[in-house]
Amino acid sequence: TMHLNWLPKERQLITLCLKPKQLPQEEADFIATKFDNTIICKNENELLDLFLKFIEDADILSGWNSEGFDIPYVVNRTIQVLGKSETARFCLWEKFPRKRQYVKFGNEQETYDLIGRVHLDYLELYRKYTYHEMHSYRLDAIGEHEIGEKKIPYEGTLDQLYNSDFEKFIAYNRQDTALLAKLDEKLKFIDLANELAHANTVLLPTTMGAVAVTEQAI
């Protein structure tokens, strides 16, 4: 699910999904009609191609813990399903995402930097621009603390939810993205990072790592 904030409000939340194999097509299509702007794709090729078309106009991509999960996952799936040449669509100027290793909580992780298009991990924005320590930095906990909303609860694994209750799976996915959009609507940390970058004549991602830049701006 994506939230495209440059679209009219009723079209901003868009969900692309594949139906569970055992679910009849007619039933999957009916479930999709219960949600706005929800598209059942024929296969993963179509899903990834549509996703890349939707983000074409995006200057900034953001997600919760997206540096360590969403970005590497979707770039790697694009390589495997569509081919490496298609990953240039994540970037500008016909460049390709650049693989980068980094250490988080003592563990080495791998992500991709998107050339020409900015990616800001909202979890890292939240940790950087709030001045209180939270017991948990899960989206569920932050959503409840900041806007009084939580993720949709479910039992078992996400894979089990997908196969046993496709409607709830879609609702869960959409709520995750809606939570993030509402958080930024309140906190405006993407705007803050943008203002700091312009004020200090640095690239947006620099505001995530350069303490001196932030202190100078404040």
Where is each model-derived feature located?
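Entry/capping segment at the start of metal-dependent catalytic domains
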Residues: 1-9
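Generic recognition of stable, solvent-exposed alpha-helical segments in well-folded globular domains
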Residues: 46, 50-53, 69-73, 117, ...
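Phosphate/oxyanion-binding loops and surfaces in catalytic or ligand/nucleic-acid-binding neighborhoods
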Residues: 81, 145-149, 190
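Conserved DEDDh/DEDDy metal-dependent 3′-5′ exonuclease domain
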Residues: 15-133
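Intrinsically disordered or highly flexible coil/loop and linker segments, enriched in small
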Residues: 57-61, 131-135, 152-153, 178-179, ...
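Common nucleic-acid-contacting/processivity interface regions adjacent to the catalytic cores
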Residues: 159-218
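C-terminal or mid-to-C-terminal helical accessory/interaction module adjacent to the motor/catalytic core
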Residues: 129, 134-167, 173
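Acidic carboxylate-rich catalytic motifs and surrounding loops in phosphoryl-/glycosyl-chemistry enzymes
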Residues: 66, 123-125, 156-158, 194-198
